[in-house]
Amino acid sequence: MKPIKEGKVREIYDNGDSLIMVATDRISCFDVILRNKVDKKGTVLTQMSKFWFDMTRDIVPNHMISVDVNDMPEFFRKPEFDGNSMMCRKLEMLPIECIVRGYITGSGWESYQKTGFVCGIRLPEGLKESEKLPEPIYTPSTKAEIGDHDENISYEKSIEVLEKQFPGKGEEYAKALKDLTIALYKKCADYAAEHGIIIADTKFEFGLDEEGRVVLGDEMLTPDSSRFWPADSYEPGHSQASFDKQFARDWLKQNPDNDWTLPDEIVQKTQDKYLQAYRMLTGKEL
């Protein structure tokens, strides 16, 4: 079988009335796929998504059918697909990346320093970098093709984008995406905080099922789609340590002549962070 779509990290296969999403061990930084692979990274992404999908079915249905390769065609019953593959319902994906920020960091912090706003939302004066916001904010963006950058947009603009594709439904879908995104974030951030992890921000993607219902798709609250910070070292006023590919990003910035290859030590540290986040949140080892 050949994938019908190959992203920087995931491969998607058509399985008739379902899709099979395979999370590889590839790692991308600054929109480039690095030459190294991070062992077990794909399994962390898939199993962590499963964990959150199971936890949040009371808020919104999701696209997951199974992560058991025995439920999938023969082609996937091999070690390289075991643990990192998910059979999913087919959805008509909505053209909005649903970003929610509970803390002021990253591009949001840069925008706030310049203007006092983040994606059209005015924030209180005097916030420090990495400070918790009074309430989580919803900052949607448009989905870019591979190689392009997503564009942050206002909530009002998200209504326009959705209305263009779904005449008469733009406002309804935009409100549903906003409300679901914030409800998911609040529930999961509260759970994570009890397990020693701050979810600073994250992104969700939604689609429509065959009956036109909004369904959560893609991945959910992984170190690739979220900023996870260790709660025990959290201190506003500067950037925070994180459970993701920050080691890789920092090394690449400090070594511009790198030919997109990481030293083994940086690969190992990155793997350790992914596994640690999974262990803290789920209580399980991989």
Language-model segments: residues:
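Active-site loop/lid in soluble adenylation, ligation, and acyl-transfer enzymes
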Residues: 1-145, 258-286
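Coil-to-beta-strand transition motifs
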Residues: 18, 93-95, 195-199, 211-214
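Intrinsically disordered, low-complexity acidic/polar segments
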Residues: 30, 109-110, 211, 225-227
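Surface-exposed helix-capping loop/turn segments at secondary-structure junctions
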Residues: 57-63, 187-199, 212, 282-286
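Conserved metal-phosphate-binding beta-hairpin within the catalytic cores
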Residues: 100, 199-220
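Anionic ligand-binding catalytic core segments
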Residues: 114-117, 122-172, 216, 220-281
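A long amphipathic alpha-helix within ATP-dependent nucleotide-binding catalytic cores
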Residues: 166-200
